[in-house]
């Protein structure tokens, strides 16, 4: 029987305006094809592949962190009707992973390169993996003797760090995330001219939400400037219609505001990715684990993608904080306007015994916080107790980290 643990969970009612009711709000999302997101996606894909290999061959996930991926932009010559990639982008995978177990070598670098290629092939249809990118692995080596490995049921935090989460999303946050998902999802069927490097910046002033969208075009699907601008107009209309599904606020949409028709300046690419022409990327420089960059909310600067999913609290606690915040809002009904969660680790402590879990709640007017405090504490305690459940969800690709 599991020993009951007394966790340091602090629940506090705070009096401040929730984000949704403030005069100004700014929210950003870097789409899956943005160079920073490409780095995140590859880092996480490599971690998943290594984890699966370790589990299959050794029965457990061995130590690794593959959170150092750099995307170095190439050079291209995009043209209406189809251009060419002149120099491939360069992708460097680094970090550290267990490469020797009981004297037996593990093909870490081969696993990493295959994972990166598979990820790119799965997500970016117009990228020629063999010619448009160069992928290199410089993952550092580590070795262990499994006979002396510590009990996996007693995993300790490998860092003193913190995770941050909040709920619920505001309309602006919901729309910014949904817009990128829409453009890189269902919209591809009707507008194949639009590539995967999408960035959405949301700016709300009172009850008007402005969306500025940078959308890379794929040149071979666009015959001339007239078609470019026709697609642009259609894109504005479709984004607007989709955004209005999520809000009663006014929505204004701007697409590729850097275009200059008279000077023949367009956002054209060969592959649908700006990394083909000098745009670089790094792990952790883009979206937080909830898929957004939110300067009006508390955030952690931790790079979660590629970190090991067993003991790295920078990954676990950021995702867990968001789960706890959302579950509190869901289970405690309409009395809550906003929940902020921060979980702090202390190196050497079990990951399910954080140094503190701080939960701040903004309630609706005339609500007695004492009605909810015990339930909120219980929700947080339960989710922390089951933090190990997140590991398999990371390995199975069921949890996003960017």
Swiss-Prot record:
GO terms for biological process: one-carbon metabolic process; S-adenosylmethionine biosynthetic process. Its cofactor is Mg(2+). Keywords: ATP-binding, Magnesium, Nucleotide-binding, One-carbon metabolism, Transferase. The keyword Nucleotide-binding applies. Pathway: Amino-acid biosynthesis; S-adenosyl-L-methionine biosynthesis; S-adenosyl-L-methionine from L-methionine: step 1/1. Gene3D superfamilies: 3.30.300.10, S-adenosylmethionine synthetase, C-terminal domain (3.30.300.280), S-adenosylmethionine synthetase, N-terminal domain (3.30.300.340). It catalyses: L-methionine + ATP + H2O = S-adenosyl-L-methionine + phosphate + diphosphate. Its EC number is 2.5.1.6. GO terms for molecular function: ATP binding; magnesium ion binding; methionine adenosyltransferase activity. ATP binds at residues 140-145. InterPro entries: AdoMet_synthase_2, AdoMet_synthase_2_family, AdoMet_synthase_3, S-AdoMet_synthetase_arc. It is an enzyme of class 2 (transferase). Catalyzes the formation of S-adenosylmethionine from methionine and ATP. PANTHER family: S-ADENOSYLMETHIONINE SYNTHASE. This is S-adenosylmethionine synthase. It comes from Picrophilus torridus (strain ATCC 700027 / DSM 9790 / JCM 10055 / NBRC 100828 / KAW 2/3). The gene is mat.
